[in-house]
Structures are given as C-alpha cells and as structure tokens.
Amino acid sequence: MKKKIKIGILGGSFDPAHKGHLKISKIAIKKLKLDKILWVITNKNPFKKKPFYSLSERILIAKKIIKNTKKIQVTYLDKIVGSSRSIKIIEHLIIKKKLKNIYFMIGSDNLVTFHKWKSWKKLVKLTKLTVFSRSGYDKKGKKSIVAKYLKNKIIFINNKPIL
C-alpha cells in the first residue's frame, strides 16, 4: 500500500521571507510529521498594499532561507493557476498534482480575518487548517467566525509566537 504523503502549504507574499517562516515550517514538519512543505509565493496579497520587494527578489530570498532544508520547497503558481487566491492554488494542487493530505498553514492573525478570504469554507473542507501563534492574536483567532464554524477541527500549534 502506498504511503499517504502529508504536505504543508504556507502561502503568501513573503515580503520578505524570514527565519520565522523557516522556524514554523520546521515545527510543522516535526509536530505534524509532514513529508514536505511548499512555500507558495504569490505575486500580490489581496489584503495588502504593493509589495516592498519584487516577486523575483522574494523568490530568491525565500530560496536562500530554505537552502539545505530538504523538506521545504519554494514555488510560484500564480501564472500556472491564473490566480493568487489560495482556493485556486489548493484546487490546482489537488487536481493537477493529485495531492490529498494537505495542511493549510496560517498565523492566528490570519484566522481573525479568514472569513473574508475567497471561498474559505471550501478551502477548509479541502485541507486541514493549521494555525500558528502570532503575538496578540491567539485569543482573537480562537474566538473568530472561522474557529466557531470549524469548532474543534482546527489544528493549533502552540509555538513561541512570532511577532
């Protein structure tokens, strides 16, 4: 019987990628026993202003940070998928790459406003929502619309909060 591969998805503008991203990725690999994490860099974040770094600079910085880390891979899918929306990227990974066991990783700051994301209910049906601590957001995140909707289905990782 074929082993079911467990994939973590950490998406965003990565403006820029930093050691905090690497730290939570390593924690997720260990705690969730993930086979791989994809850092899915998007050209633009619909909730943020224009990025400080160019897309090519952000990809380069991310690749430098994960150098010598075998289980983390940097990818850019906006052009292939035709969108930077998380739901479109997840659907692409499921349909085209045949991925099934996906852990969608966000910070507790994003959990607070996750109900504003496009097709968020579909996104949480297709993945295992995994939430990392962010300073000042954990309590708000646990009381959020999405947390109430999912009840006990969110995986909370109690890491040392990243600022």
Per-segment meaning from a language model:
Residues 1-163:
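Nucleotidyltransferase catalytic core that binds NTPs
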